[in-house]
């Protein structure tokens, strides 16, 4: 079968969380996950904070059951949405009462991506620390046991948010300056770069995490 899983910027994490369970229980033998977005098609040139941040990109991975003797695994996953952030990142047009046929010169900006960056940042600063603490407690994991954190490259505020979550510089990947926000391809793209650069090796504990429209937060713990 083929299907879409859409949690915007954390779609890859949602897909891995769902299908790793289905591979583990034997429902599927092999699953191909493709994550890609052409953000440039919906960016508003009058909104510099988003127009200059987002990039087009794609990434892919194949999920299979670990071979006998290997300990690679997805160990924990959790997702949560705080609906008070629903209108902080959105495209108002395109569906429901505002289909593409309704677009005209007067409402054109409703069909562009709209982001209220400062509001998102404040909401993340309030919600994320407790969320991460709860996840690590449920997973029975400490920050010291995690070899590398691969966060969604949401914005340049990454270097401000990560220390608030208890992760010092050098314990996480920050490539916003090089690649921008690659939307759903962000986490797998940066994870691939970390593997290519040998920042992680087999058996290392990795934390994948990200924020998305909603405001949705997604976290995965995996042993590479």
Describe the residue ranges of each PLM region.
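Short, well-ordered, mixed-charge alpha-helical segments that flank or form enzyme active sites
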Residues: 11-14, 39-43, 83-86
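Flexible, glycine-rich active-site loops centered on histidine and acidic residues
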Residues: 20, 24-58
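Acidic-glycine-rich active-site phosphate/pyrophosphate-binding loop
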Residues: 32-39, 100-106, 157-169
């Amino acid at each position: 079968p083929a299907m879409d899983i859409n949690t915007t910027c954390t779609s890859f994490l949602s897909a891995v969380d769902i299908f790793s369970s289905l591979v583990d229980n034997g429902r599927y033998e092999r699953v191909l996950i493709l994550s890609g977005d052409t953000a440039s098609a919906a960016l508003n040139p009058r909104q510099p904070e988003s127009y200059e941040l987002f990039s087009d990109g794609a990434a892919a991975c194949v999920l299979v059951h670990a071979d006998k003797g290997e300990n690679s695994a997805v160990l924990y996953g959790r997702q949560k949405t705080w609906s008070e952030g629903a209108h902080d990142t959105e495209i108002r047009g395109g569906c429901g009462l505002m289909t593409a046929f309704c677009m005209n010169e007067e409402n054109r900006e409703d069909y562009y991506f709209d982001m209220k960056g400062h509001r998102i940042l404040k909401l993340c600063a309030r919600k994320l620390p407790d969320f991460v603490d709860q996840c690590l407690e449920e997973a029975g994991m400490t920050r010291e046991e995690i070899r590398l954190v691969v966060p969604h490259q949401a914005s340049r505020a990454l270097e401000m948010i990560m220390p608030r979550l208890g992760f010092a510089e050098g314990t996480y990947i920050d490539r916003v300056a090089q690649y921008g926000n690659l939307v759903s391809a962000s986490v797998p793209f940066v994870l691939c770069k970390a593997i290519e650069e040998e920042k992680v090796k087999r058996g290392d504990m990795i934390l994948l995490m990200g924020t998305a429209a909603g405001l949705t937060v997604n976290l995965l713990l995996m042993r590479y």
